[in-house]
């Protein structure tokens, strides 16, 4: 019977064997003594696998908002439904690992959600996010960010963020790191798409490479 995520106990199997084989008390004790090393090895392995899996489950981040929302709901179900089932079945160690790990992670992210008045830290399972006109996505910690888009919109993750003017366009970094990254350069491509370059460092030059005698202004325009 699986009591934990991976922890397998053979106690039930031993009890059924003793019952069906009509073993005496001495024979049953001898059987249990023989399987003690196997039981200990199984419990240690189950503990390690459970710990690794729960840690991965608590920190995993999906690529889209909807998938992150499903993962957030799965974590709540693990706390509210799965952990009590583990306790009821007697898997106290597994239940403790699940509750302690997930609760610690949720409380850590709840602090940033409360501080910045947004639930997206919990949904995205990240302590640092970049915001653009109310939309959020992961921030990799680099001093520059390049986003794709069009003449009046920017693609932030899977969201399309429209804007009227580029003059007030910037990325708000919030969470464990806090800063504003201004829009420094806009690159217009031949196919009509745009590249928006946000950076906390000033741009000192733009180098055109790989066009083989074709001038940059024939294919793209760069504006501040």
Curated annotation (Swiss-Prot):
<dbReference type="GO" id="GO:0033644">
    <property type="term" value="C:host cell membrane"/>
</dbReference>
<dbReference type="InterPro" id="IPR046445">
    <property type="entry name" value="a/bCoV_VIROPORIN_3A-like_TM"/>
</dbReference>
<dbReference type="GO" id="GO:0016020">
    <property type="term" value="C:membrane"/>
</dbReference>
<feature type="domain" description="CoV 3a-like viroporin TM">
    <location>
        <begin position="34"/>
        <end position="124"/>
    </location>
</feature>
<feature type="domain" description="CoV 3a-like viroporin CD">
    <location>
        <begin position="128"/>
        <end position="203"/>
    </location>
</feature>
<keyword id="KW-0472">Membrane</keyword>
<keyword id="KW-1133">Transmembrane helix</keyword>
<dbReference type="InterPro" id="IPR046446">
    <property type="entry name" value="a/bCoV_VIROPORIN_3A-like_CD"/>
</dbReference>
<dbReference type="Pfam" id="PF03053">
    <property type="entry name" value="Corona_NS3b"/>
</dbReference>
<feature type="transmembrane region" description="Helical">
    <location>
        <begin position="95"/>
        <end position="111"/>
    </location>
</feature>
<protein>
    <recommendedName>
        <fullName>Non-structural protein 3</fullName>
    </recommendedName>
</protein>
<feature type="transmembrane region" description="Helical">
    <location>
        <begin position="69"/>
        <end position="88"/>
    </location>
</feature>
<dbReference type="InterPro" id="IPR004293">
    <property type="entry name" value="Coronavirus_Orf3a/b"/>
</dbReference>
<keyword id="KW-0812">Transmembrane</keyword>
<feature type="transmembrane region" description="Helical">
    <location>
        <begin position="40"/>
        <end position="60"/>
    </location>
</feature>
<keyword id="KW-1043">Host membrane</keyword>
């Amino acid at each position: 019977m699986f009591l934990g995520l991976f922890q397998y106990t053979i106690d039930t199997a031993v009890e059924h064997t003793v019952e069906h084989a009509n073993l005496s008390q001495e024979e049953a004790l001898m059987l249990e003594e023989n399987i003690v090393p196997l039981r200990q090895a199984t419990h240690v392995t189950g503990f390690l696998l459970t710990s690794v899996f729960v840690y991965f489950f608590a920190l995993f981040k999906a690529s889209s908002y909807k998938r992150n929302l499903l993962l957030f709901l799965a974590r709540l179900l693990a706390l509210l439904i799965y952990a009590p089932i583990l306790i009821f079945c007697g898997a106290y160690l597994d239940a403790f690992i699940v509750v302690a790990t997930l609760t610690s992670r949720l409380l850590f992210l709840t602090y940033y959600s409360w501080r910045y008045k947004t639930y997206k830290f919990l949904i995205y399972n990240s302590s640092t996010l970049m915001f653009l006109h109310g939309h959020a996505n992961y921030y990799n910690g680099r001093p520059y960010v390049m986003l794709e888009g069009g003449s009046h919109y920017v693609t932030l993750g899977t969201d399309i963020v429209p804007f009227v003017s580029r003059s007030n366009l910037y990325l708000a970094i919030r969470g464990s790191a806090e800063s504003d990254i201004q829009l420094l350069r806009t690159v217009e491509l031949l196919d009509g798409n745009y590249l928006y370059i946000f950076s906390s460092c000033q741009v000192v030059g733009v180098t055109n490479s790989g066009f083989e005698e074709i001038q940059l202004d024939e294919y793209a325009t760069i504006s501040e």
